[in-house]
Amino acid sequence: MFRSALFLLLAPLALSHTTFTTLYVDEVNQGDGTCVRMNRDANTVTYPIEPLSSKDIACGKDGEKAVSRVCPAKANSLLTFEFRAWADGAQPGSIDISHKGPCAVYMKKVDDATADNNAAGDGWFKIWHTGYDESTEKWCTEKLIDNNGFLSVRVPSDIEQGYYLVRTELLALHAASDAPPDPQFYVNCAQIFVQGGGSAKPETVSIGEGYYSLDSPGVKYNIYEKPLQLPYPIPGPTVYESKGVEERSVCPAQKRTATAQNKGLKPAGCILQRDNWCGFEVPDYSDENGCWASSKKCWDQSDVCYKTALPTGISACDIWMTKCNGIDEACNSGDFNGPPNKGKVLTPEPKKLAGSTQVFKRDVRKYKKWTA
């Protein structure tokens, strides 16, 4: 189909740099693009935030546009983020080796993770970061490359149950000491619902327009200086230190009103998942008119699948197109009892995590209070 061919033509243009594509919760693959806010342009999906002063620094380009799915996690769950140089995985690689720098992960509690325009602004707290590991002489991005593009963190065990945005941030410093400085931030957000937890309310910062300054030592840092000026001053606030969950009594009324996830769940009847889109079985039919009517409903869904696909790929849409072709073949051959393979789940088995889930050694040195 034309849309499929067009997507393949555009894909090579998105080779540059990196982007977060896939969330794993406790080592379970949620699906490419599922629950992930990302740049929806395949040509620029792996590009850094420009300009640095943009509010896109919160969740990336198109980061104020929510997706329909929210991935469930638990307090203390292991979140693993996969980064790719090619969003659809057409070629291997996570980020160019020259793009050396720190990594950080933030969270923000929101009323509704499926709502637009809730990324930039107050409410963010950092749950993990690491910069330059003097024991291995490697930057976080170098460790990321060594680990096939996988980066893992733990959800704090004591934060409140509810909806959260989880913000990943990679900073490439290869041009940060240029004149003018050109630090490259790669930012995306995942939508999750944290189950369990406690009542902790971490101190937060506002991330948006003007959050980072080119005058910040960690932003304009010279990675080529010998010896390096260490310790490296990681940009942003200090990491929130989880205190664990205290035992506390909960009255029946509180239990009845406790928040439960009711948004962003996988729809019932979904037989094919493509990032945040689902394909649904077409109506039964027993005559020629019904057969072609169901064929049309299948192709209507196919059209939406191709038109709304994230840069992570259209392979699921190709699977759906095969289903529609099968219905057409049945209609043309006079087989008017269907649909064929009714209700068969077509979503491929998700790939296994291909890297270590060990959390990279965190930089725990104390710095002076950070200012942007």
Swiss-Prot record:
Task: Give the cofactors, semicolon-separated.
Answer: Cu(2+)
The UniProt annotation places Cu(2+) binding at: H17, H99, Y186
Q: Which reaction does it catalyse?
A: [(1->4)-beta-D-glucosyl]n+m + reduced acceptor + O2 = 4-dehydro-beta-D-glucosyl-[(1->4)-beta-D-glucosyl]n-1 + [(1->4)-beta-D-glucosyl]m + acceptor + H2O
Instruction: Specify the inducers.
Output: Expression is up-regulated on steam-exploded bagasse as carbon source compared to glucose.
Give, as one word, the top-level EC class: oxidoreductase
Binding positions for O2 per the UniProt entry: H174, Q184
Give me the comment on cofactor binding.
Binds 1 copper ion per subunit.
Q: How is this protein used?
A: Lignocellulose is the most abundant polymeric composite on Earth and is a recalcitrant but promising renewable substrate for industrial biotechnology applications. Together with cellobiose dehydrogenases (CDHs) an enzymatic system capable of oxidative cellulose cleavage is formed, which increases the efficiency of cellulases and put LPMOs at focus of biofuel research.
Task: Give the matching InterPro entries.
Answer: AA9, AA9_LPMO
**Biological process, per Gene Ontology:** cellulose catabolic process
Compartments in which it is found:
Secreted
Q: Does the keyword Metal-binding apply?
A: yes
What are the alphabetically sorted keywords of the record?
Answer: Carbohydrate metabolism, Cellulose degradation, Copper, Disulfide bond, Metal-binding, Monooxygenase, Oxidoreductase, Polysaccharide degradation, Secreted, Signal
Q: Which cysteines are joined by disulfide bonds?
A: C59-C189
Its function?
Answer: Lytic polysaccharide monooxygenase (LPMO) that depolymerizes crystalline and amorphous polysaccharides via the oxidation of scissile alpha- or beta-(1-4)-glycosidic bonds, yielding C1 or C4 oxidation products. Catalysis by LPMOs requires the reduction of the active-site copper from Cu(II) to Cu(I) by a reducing agent and H(2)O(2) or O(2) as a cosubstrate.
Q: What is this protein called?
A: AA9 family lytic polysaccharide monooxygenase C
Q: Which organism is it from?
A: Aspergillus tamarii
